[in-house]
Regions:
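Conserved "right-hand" nucleotidyltransferase catalytic core of DNA-directed polymerases
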Residues: 1-145
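Helical catalytic core of nucleic-acid polymerases
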Residues: 94-222
């Protein structure tokens, strides 16, 4: 009974969407809801996401034998400190064949803080402990709304097999999302669509959004 009560918001979310779009979504996970919506938008625009291979329906994809880092690091990315300039130069000379665990151990200590680099982006964390604000210092928690989707749109990133039309549809979905109030089923569904198509499923080998070069362009620059 407790599990059911906790599940009510998710059940209602799927029921409301199902009624509006005329589909049964009760058993779909969040990512599938988002992916299916974006796939429908692409196919409405004449962009095929699937093809027949030996009589079986298969997702269209772009596979990469290797990815040159210099091809995905944006020209706008520049550093002033020698420590970061050295890493930037080194990364531009790398060619990767995998998308995970490639740059383990690559880091820079700057200003007493350690920055770790990887194919998932730039990360850093202070040592565990208690932090409190005072008269001289405040704790600032900053977030960027739709950060990865904004990178996709600003730099026109798209899975190679889906053409640049992907970018226009993607931007329209983002604008559409913000036309709905936060907390509405529509807003939630469009957020799922943006996250799946513009990032999460670009490295999913079972998805029609699969193109690891796009994944790396988003995470390394973002």
């Amino acid at each position: 009974a407790k599990f059911f009560r906790l599940s009510i918001p998710q059940i209602k979310f799927r029921e409301d969407l199902g009624i509006k779009h005329g589909k049964h979504m009760l058993w779909d996970n969040d990512k599938k809801i988002g992916s299916n919506y974006f796939i429908a938008r692409l196919q409405e625009a004449g962009i095929e996401c699937y093809e027949k291979v030996n009589g079986e329906r298969q997702p269209r994809q772009t596979h990469r034998s290797h990815i040159k880092m210099k091809d995905i690091i944006f020209p706008i990315v520049k550093f002033e400190s020698p420590e970061f300039q050295q890493v930037h130069q080194w990364l531009n000379g790398q060619v990767i064949t995998e998308t995970k665990g490639v740059f383990d151990g690559l880091n820079v200590v700057y200003g007493g803080f350690r920055f770790d680099f990887g194919t998932g982006g730039l990360h850093g964390c202070i040592s565990s402990g208690y932090v409190d604000s005072d008269d001289d210092c405040i704790i600032l928690d900053a977030d960027v709304g739709s950060y990865y989707p904004s990178i996709d749109i600003q730099y026109r990133l798209f899975p190679a097999h889906l053409s640049e039309k992907f970018c226009d549809i993607y931007e329209d979905v983002k604008n559409q999302r913000f036309s709905y109030a936060k907390g509405t089923p529509e807003n939630a569904m469009l957020k799922l669509a943006l996250n799946a198509a513009g990032f999460g499923d670009t490295n999913n080998e079972f998805s029609p959004f699969f193109d690891p070069k796009m994944t790396m362009a988003v995470t390394v620059n973002g």
